[in-house]
Amino acid sequence: MELKQWHDFCLCPLGGACPPDAVPADAPFSPLVFLVRRDPLRSRGLFAVTVLDEVFEAETAGVLLPPVQRPTPAEPLREFVAANGACVLNTAFSAAFSVLERWNRERTEPLRVTLVGLGDVGGTLLLALKLLGREIGALRIYDPNAAQCRRYELELNQVLPLDHPLPPVTVCTEDTLFDCDLLLFTASRGVPPVGSGVADVRLAQYEKNRVMLRSYAAMARKTHFTGLFCQISDPVDPLACAVFRESNRNAAGEFDGCGLLPEQVQGFGLGVMEARARWCAQEDGIDFSNGRVYGPHGGGLVAANDPAAYDKAVSARLTERAVHANLEVRALGFKPYLAPALSSAAVSILSLVRGQPYDAALPLGGVWLGAQRRMTPLGPLQRREPLHPALLARFEAARLELEAFCHDA
């Protein structure tokens, strides 16, 4: 395999093009980047691998399983990847190398975070990040309601620290939204009121929120944003897909791959489903110490008592309870926003920036589907482990269902 050096990266072109100023390299070194060129609508953009065979595998439910290693003679690159790791970069995206450099850059300053939307979820998330976000150097807030922004700016800058400095809260303008490392999007339209009788609240919000997100996706494109767009408002998974696609449309509405990479858009709705499954398991006396959740936030969720020792009946009951747990809160006359804001957003996002495992929806075969991953400088690293065949089939069914929805929407 050909190797080239570009800046501090070792590039290995496998169909993807090297930058023109790349020069030949004699031996592999870290970070090693495999360059591919794949359909940008249905392929990942930047992701970490630990085994050479992961570079070539199809984007199906199989990415949850331990990678299948071909019985080939020892290869220098195979041994190098096993020892040092690597990543795959899809050069079909015009911003591929810019994002690669940004994510690999050593962080010398605290994170700058922009929060869009100060409703119930946004306000709760802001409180959590103010108190817990020791990695955050600036919390920038934006909401069309100027009084709401000013209120949070005043009150949260009057909070005393407990054991670490607290990030200042400042109001930002629309034209500086993407001057940050992470943009957290919680704004929402058309949330059905309590008692409305709407069966699937998340899907009822989809079209209105999708329209609202178009302008923000266009701004991300215009500003050449290389950070993370964290989609939090519902329905998380299809809206994350919509943000990615809208950011990659030109003025004529054509997809051109000149916007965000798929992994730059991550959906945060799965954390609360894990928390609900754990709570329901505790109430029902079910061992969830090795439990997992996969798939979309809401309908299509897959909760499993154990990835390998999978009990279909027990897991089906857990899934049903987790999916409908929010309705119990609505039946009491309240909007169920506290647990999602804390579990899906605050805890998951802080786990991401700390390099810890976190629940989120990321791209797989052109749709955004939830599973556990860990963020690295080489992109997200998928958690891979043996899965019961029935559980794997459920995950693949959820993926295909979401694929049909997203591609028809």
Predicted regions and their residues:
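Glycine/serine-rich phosphate-binding loop and adjoining beta1-alpha1 elements at the start
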Residues: M1-P110
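Long, compositionally biased stretches enriched for glycine and/or charged residues
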Residues: L52-R70, Q282-A409
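Hydrophobic/small residue at the entry helix of a nucleotide-binding pocket
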Residues: D120-T124
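Short beta-strand element of Class I
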Residues: I136-R140
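Conserved N-terminal Rossmann-fold NAD(P) cofactor-binding segment
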Residues: Y142-C180
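Rossmann-like NAD(P)-binding element
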Residues: L166-T226
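Rossmann-like dinucleotide-binding core of oxidoreductases
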Residues: S233-D306
